[in-house]
Amino acid sequence: MANEELTESQQQEDPSQQLPNADEEKGSDSDSNSDSDASSQSSGDDFYISESENEAEGDNTIFNYVRPSDIPPDPNANPETNIRRFNRVLDGKRVKRMQEEEEDKYTFYEDLFDFPRDPERWKEQDLREIWADGPLEMTKPGWDPAWADEDDWDVVNDEIQEGRDPGIQPFYVPYRKPYPAIPDNHYDIENAKGVVEELDRIEEFLQWVSYIFPDGSSYEGTVWDDLAQGKGVYIAENGLVRYEGEWLQNDMEGHGVIDVDIPDIEPIPGSKLEAKMRAEGRIIKRDYMTPEDRKWLEMDVEDSVALTDGNFQVPFYENEEWVTQFGEKPEKGRYRYAGQWKHSRMHGCGVYEVNERILYGRFYFGELLEEEHGCTVDICALHSGLAEVAAAKARMFVNKPDGMIREERGPYGDPQHPYFYEEDDVWMAPGFINQFYEVPEYWETYVGEVDQEREMWLNSFYKAPLRLPMPAELEHWWENVEVTPEFVLLNKEPEPDPNDPSKLVQKEDPVILHTPTGRIINYVEDEKHGIRLFWQPPLEEGEEVDPSKVEFLPLGFDEFYGKEVVVKKEHPIKSFVLGIEKSVKPMLDGLEKWTEEKKKAYEERKEMIQQELELVEAEICLEEAIEDMDEELKKKEQEEEKKTEMGLTEEDEDVLVPVYKEEKVVTAKEKIQENKQEEKYKDDDDEDDDDGDDDDDDDDDDDLGPSSFGSADKGRRNSPFSSSSLSFASCTLFPAVQSRLESSFLAWKQHRAEPSKVNTGIIKGADTASASIHFPPLSSNNARLKMGKVANRGCVQRSYGSSRSQSQLMSLSRLLSCNASSSSSPPDSSSSEYLKDSGLWETPVGDMSVVLSLQIQTKCSDLFAETPAVS
């Protein structure tokens, strides 16, 4: 009942309460209308409000209820007073105290990622690190005095000039973006523990990459957001620097091992530097190589020098910047550090080895401190071992199957699983769990144990109910398991070995099948390139491949794409000259050929003419010889006729014929002719000596011809003409002359008359001719024994024909005279004394070079000794 009464009373009061509001609303409407009218009148047609807009505004109007009160409104309730009152309240102590309490309770966003406070209260000085903020003008994330450049020092000098005191030694920590990149509204991260868990999850999404950079360096390992993160291997250009270990946003940080090799200078073979080093007693590596290795090294050096074409580059270890920074160049040899790293510097505890000299201690951004500062031998050995483990884990990521390094270096066993044994021995088993190659027997036990552990680890991924990220090697294997391989190795079924049937052997070499094209690739041994691959054509049964008709695969990119040939533009004048030369060349070649043919024909014609001349000369010589023979025959015929007229017998004839010749009176004219003839003979002899061997032999044959006239035995009484046939036969071309001479001489002998007595006075009064053997002393080594004639008063020399015929006739006459004198001389003492006194057989003193043959001298002396003088 009470509630009903209350509602009724409220309903009764509502009209009374709504009336003033209605009046006010009307008043407000009237005011608004009046205002709108006034505004519309003032603005004219420029401003117009539609009725629909007025209705909308009326619907959206909020009605405020003001409780009636007996207190009159405050006359000072204006905006300025209200603002002044609010400021007095906000500046009060109570409000400030409340704000401080709220601020203390508030957790800033940056504080969410702070690790718990250090109860030991470590400071920068305790860490041997001085941290500071860089100047505002410093555009780089940080700087270090040891590695600062000119821009960094300019900023520091400006700070000093402005009166500030920037730290000279501090190392400014480079700014790093938050790791990981966590959004503000991440619901999984509320504190430091959430950050660690997020890092663990992100670690599973690291990517395995294999890069080769433009400068020749390479990196193989894990990356996060295109930055080296996790574990990896970095190899600098030429492989002189190698780092294996942990990375943090492209910086070597954590534990790792670095190997640096600074090679010693090796001189070029045969250079002045080599001679200088040998003089100093330096050791040259080439001296300890095998002959084959030394030969290959020399060829490599020769090719390198030829290809560089005079260009060279100073290596980093020979750069003068080392002297500028450190005062001297680094020591040649091997450097190795295993330990802690920070900001790509040796920072912390570690072991440093320089050419087998071991150093250990605390390193401060690459510099070894004098004091240990807690890095004792044991601590350094511990961190060195951790670095070796990190390096071994980093090496697990080398040789990525589809990486750039594998593509550059060529074929390589697919993904590698290294096994590490005692004493740091390593054996690489290609393939996933040795599926391609078997493990050596002496490692089977150890590998079996390792494989069991590895299979348990891999099975955790195989049998997982959900699809979890797997190791990179399994991801790669599963992605390519359905892909058809590009090349397949084809082998025939093995056959039993004839020597050992229990073993199966392959009798033919395998071939390669190119699956995209279906063609077979075979190979053949090549002397130049070793092994050449070629596309094998279809073969019939029993047919063999002909290497000369097959299509070989290209040896490299140059052969595949074609080596670009640089065409040099020639000068127009040079090209014009070459064109003329090319057009004229056939004409010149034809002219040269015609000249050679003419020259050859001329030489042949010349040879024919020489042969004709020789034949003509032979004919002339033959005619002269025949004429000389005819003259000699006439002479002999006249002598025989004279003998028959004188009535000499055959016995007297043999002795008196030469004496009769000697009885002839020698006139002055004949003596002059004789002297001239002798001089002519001497000149001919001198000319013959100056000629070649053929002329000397001919002259010797002519001079020594008479020595072959028969035998010189006593008691022989043959006709002197019988022996002359030998001499004529040697001088003429026709042997028929001998028979003609013999027949004519026999006919003359048969018709001769009886010879008359010859007066002995003829012999006594006549001058005798002497013939002897004489060997004068000769100073020349070319001296020879020659035959000559001694000219006496009772002997006249006549010239018949040529000199050749004269020498033959002289030899014949002398032989005949000797035979005749030997047969007719008496063996009394008076004749011998007379002959001795007359000097017939004495050795000629005036002309020592005139000699006769030894046979003639002996024969003549014996005959005169036995023949009596003619009375």
Swiss-Prot record:
Domain of life: Eukaryota
Cysteines paired by S-S bonds: none
InterPro entries per the UniProt record, alphabetical: MORN
Phosphothreonine PTM positions: 649
The keyword Lyase is annotated on this UniProt entry: no
Keywords of this entry: Chloroplast, Coiled coil, Membrane, Phosphoprotein, Plastid, Plastid inner membrane, Protein transport, Repeat, Transport
Pfam families, alphabetized: MORN
GO biological process, one term: chloroplast organization
Keyword Membrane: yes
Tissue: Preferentially expressed in ovules, and moderately expressed in leaves and siliques.
Main localization, broad class: plastid
One annotated Gene Ontology cellular component of this protein: chloroplast
Consequences of knocking out this gene: Severe defects during embryogenesis, producing abnormal embryos and thereby leading to a lethality of young seedlings.
Ranges of biased composition (kind: Polar residues): 8-20
Region annotation Disordered: where it falls in the sequence: 1-85, 631-654, 669-721
Parts forming coiled coils: 587-647
UniProt repeat feature MORN, residue ranges: 219-239, 243-257, 337-352
Gene Ontology terms for molecular function: protein transmembrane transporter activity
Biased composition (Basic and acidic residues): 632-645, 669-683
Annotated Low complexity bias: 30-46
Residue positions, PTM Deamidated asparagine: 238
Residue ranges, compositional bias (Acidic residues): 684-704
Localization per Swiss-Prot or TrEMBL: Plastid, Chloroplast inner membrane
Subunit structure: Part of the Tic complex. Component of the 1-MD complex, composed of TIC20-I, TIC214, TIC100 and TIC56. Interacts with the translocating preproteins. Hydrolysis of ATP is essential for the formation of this complex. The 1-MD complex interacts with TIC21.
The protein's role, per its UniProt record: Involved in protein precursor import into chloroplasts. May be part of an intermediate translocation complex acting as a protein-conducting channel at the inner envelope. Plays an important role during embryogenesis and chloroplast biogenesis.
Protein name in UniProt: Protein TIC 100
Source organism: Arabidopsis thaliana (Mouse-ear cress)
